Amino acid sequence: MLILIETPKNLLPFKFNKTSSSISHGANNISSILLNLFINDLTIHKIIVSDISDSDYKIINKEYASKKNTLITPYKNLKSQIEKTEKIPDICINFDANITKLIHFRNINKYTYPIIGLIHSLGFYSHFKTIELTKKLLQEYDTYICPSKNTQQSLINFGFPKKNTAVISYGVNTTKFKPNNNKTQLRKDLSIATNATVILILGRVSPGLKTDLSPALKLMPNLVKKHPDLILYIAGTVLDETYLSKLKTMSKKLKIENHIIWEPFPDHKNIQKYYQVSDIFLSLSDCCAETFGLTVLEAMASSLPVIISNFAGYKDHIKHKSNGYYISSYTADCNLENDYYNPSNKEFGEIYSQSITLNYKQLKTYLLQLIQSPDLQKQIGQKARETIKEKKTQDIMYNSYKNLISHIINKKNNEEKFLEIPDYINISDLFSHQCSHQLTYNDLFYLTNDTKEKVEKESHFFFFENQLTNYDLITPIIFMLNTEPMTINQLASKLNKSKTLVAKNCLFLLKQTFIRANMT
């Protein structure tokens, strides 16, 4: 078998100069892991094409590649390299969604080998534009590997043929991600109280590109009142400094700043230590581009009980109340088109995030159950690790890739398949399957008691000013709900506004816990 692999230079396991090495994480980490597994597999012959220079090419092939049944070449030499081997690749793979360059190379040269791409992130306009470019160029057995069934469904909703997709879960290194028996010393090293109950949130700090953290902070005062030794440990690269500043201001006003540890510069090389010092893992993702949630698997492998949203790519991670807990997620049909087709991923990410709300009553209940019972923490955590070892290790992931490759090669033919693509789609329909519950226009909405008090006292609300430009019905909705509960239909009628616009504002208010709905 001869496999053609396309990869960027920065993922190659070589040091071209003193400054070329870097620590990859997230999607890049998965791509790097898969690349290394293929390179080190001596049973497979590979040609690797990359954006390397001529000098890089000489160094690599002289010192390393010949020992690994591997040839590495720059793009300009790819055709001649294939001719030298006197064998056309059986299949081609890129551990990324952008496979257009490979497709063009194949089609121009009239090769017929299948091409595989990997979807890491899918939800923004820019992501779907990449997919759109490939659709009309596909052949029969070209395939996108999706890390979750949810991601596959997003492709299908977009109009992508199911037969050109496959689902393979990510896997984690259970030797690296495991419990550490010396938690006391680890906590001392990180200046964390040894007797504290630590809830870990690990991920990018951004209101729309991972998780809006503000609702979780609002739960803390009540939890801390019952459990004064509680610590919320938030570790993640900060993508929005202004947002972080506002979260810190909020924590001070809520008087919980002494119960929060911020780690804005996590050590990605030793990322496992953050799991090993913690007791509970919390991930409430509401990002439209969430395809999997690798940190959830890392936490489970580290024997942490996880509490996660049953949103998007998270849906298949756990069995509820057995090896973790799911929090219900809600949305409604609200007009997202104008924001989606805006080229700013950040702006759309924030707006979409505020259109997703979770059942925070459930979250509080499950957190209290775990906080109050170290035995339950241990029991759920052990089952979580067993799940990973049985179903989601790196070896299982790699073998699944090899099995899929063999299957595609065996079934390939020379028929080219050109696919149609809609020019315009309803974005709410595109993401309609992401949440577990769909609010209707007839659901009743109420003000929370806290909001009623603030209205009566004319107190300050915790709002993020930049978001208010997208939600201009907040004030009238609050004052109307202060008189009586209403549905979206009723609010839209009284305000003489569209139902989708009212729904958008109501979801924001739900997200920020200013109102509640008759959610089960």
What are these language model-derived features?
Residues 54-140, 472:
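Extended catalytic core of nucleotide-activated donor transferases of GT-like folds
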Residues 68, 235-236, 244-269:
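Nucleotide-activated donor-binding/catalytic signature segment of Leloir-type glycosyltransferases, i.e.
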Residues 127-134, 138-167, 172-176:
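A short, active-site helix/loop in glycosyltransferases that binds the activated sugar's phosphate group
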Residues 178-192:
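A short helix/loop element that forms part of the nucleotide-sugar donor recognition site in Leloir-type
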Residues 193-211, 217, 233:
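Conserved donor-binding/catalytic core segment of Leloir-type glycosyltransferases
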Residues 276-291, 304-305:
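Acidic donor-binding loop of glycosyltransferase active sites
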Residues 305-308, 318, 325-326:
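Short hydrophobic beta-strand element within catalytic cores of glycosyltransferases
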Residues 344-354, 360-480, 487-490, 519-520:
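C-terminal amphipathic helix plus adjacent low-complexity
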